[in-house]
């Protein structure tokens, strides 16, 4: 009797192990995945937390979101193989690939491969109405928060101000901390390049009367001439409650990238999970409205991961996929 019971237990244990193995993704996949996201209070952070939950369910392996300073830190972590997935803006990715950004120290970062388009990053400026700031030009001599030093805004906004001949006092930091600072009147304005609605802008507007400072047509032209990677961008009216007309600005596109060493079938499964669950992605953040296959053509800089390229080919996406 004891022998029969022991055999039954062994069989049940074997079935359990096999079942767990089947539930843990493919045998040649990593045991876990980590996504490099951004600062708390930012779009990358919210998007990444939700994406990690989605992929954990769909891939049957634990996927974690890691808070970072943004694209520059994400690219460095990916190159060092400390994370396997990351969010980048294509402008910063271009600097990394070519080793041209000051932050690269001349080093080329080429471990990243494009997987899927995320959304446009419009640059947005906001001040409290009581500040008396009426335009971007008025930011001279004002205290302006621009997010983490390694984020897209932290890289680009100092250049914007130089090009536009505006001289504010710049403060970097996590978006949640900067939002507290402007709420306490320790800052005069915030400038951000992020998917709209930007979480901290929306939160501030719920408690304060705010003003969105639009770039003039001349300023848009000056920025695009100096920084050709910038495109024209529009934040639609109604994105924020007090934004009653379209907000014209410049922007960069965001992409999710993967380490080139990730298995092709895993990256294929990631693309499938994201595109097949668009409604859930939209619930994570409204900016995911642009996380659709057709927008893969927005990437003209990075090679696509072979697994992602196979997904676009199989799904008959229109366009040319840049691969290795």
Predicted region positions:
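Short, low-complexity disordered leader/linker segments with a strong preference
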Residues: 1-30, 324
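N-terminal (or domain-start) structured segment
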Residues: 25-95, 104
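Bilobed "Venus flytrap"/periplasmic-binding protein-like clamshell domains
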Residues: 32-58, 62-63, 121-184, 278-279, ...
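Acidic, polar ligand-binding/catalytic clefts
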Residues: 83-119, 195-198
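Pocket-lining segment of extracytoplasmic ligand-binding domains
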Residues: 90-92, 101-102, 131, 167-257, ...
């Amino acid at each position: 009797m004891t022998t029969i019971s022991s055999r039954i237990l062994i069989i049940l244990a074997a079935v359990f192990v096999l079942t767990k193995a089947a539930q843990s993704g493919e045998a040649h996949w990593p045991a876990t995945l980590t996504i490099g996201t951004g600062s708390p209070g930012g779009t990358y952070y919210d998007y990444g937390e939700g994406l990690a939950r989605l992929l954990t369910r769909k891939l049957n392996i634990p996927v974690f979101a890691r808070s970072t300073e943004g694209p520059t830190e994400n690219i460095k972590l990916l190159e060092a193989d400390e994370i396997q997935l990351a969010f980048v803006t294509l402008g910063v990715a271009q600097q990394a690939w070519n080793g041209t950004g000051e932050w690269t120290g001349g080093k080329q970062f080429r471990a990243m491969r494009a997987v899927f388009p995320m959304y446009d990053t419009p640059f947005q400026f906001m001040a409290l109405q009581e500040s008396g700031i009426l335009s971007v030009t008025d930011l001279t001599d004002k205290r302006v928060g621009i997010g983490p030093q390694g984020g897209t805004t932290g890289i680009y906004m100092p250049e914007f101000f130089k090009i536009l001949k505006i001289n504010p006092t710049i403060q970097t930091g996590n978006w949640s901390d900067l939002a507290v600072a402007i709420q306490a009147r320790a800052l005069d304005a915030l400038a951000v390049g992020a998917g709209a609605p930007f979480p901290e802008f929306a939160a501030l507007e719920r408690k304060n009367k705010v003003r969105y400072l639009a770039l003039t047509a001349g300023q848009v032209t000056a920025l695009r001439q100096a920084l050709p990677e910038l495109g024209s961008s529009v934040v639609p009216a109604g994105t924020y409650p007090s934004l009653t007309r379209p907000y014209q600005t410049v922007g960069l596109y965001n992409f999710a990238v993967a380490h080139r060493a990730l298995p092709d079938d895993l990256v294929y499964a990631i693309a499938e999970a994201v595109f097949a669950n668009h409604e859930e992605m939209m619930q994570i953040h409204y900016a995911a409205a642009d996380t659709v296959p057709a927008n893969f053509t927005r990437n003209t800089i990075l090679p696509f991961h072979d697994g992602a390229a196979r997904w676009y080919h199989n799904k008959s996406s229109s366009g040319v996929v840049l691969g290795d």
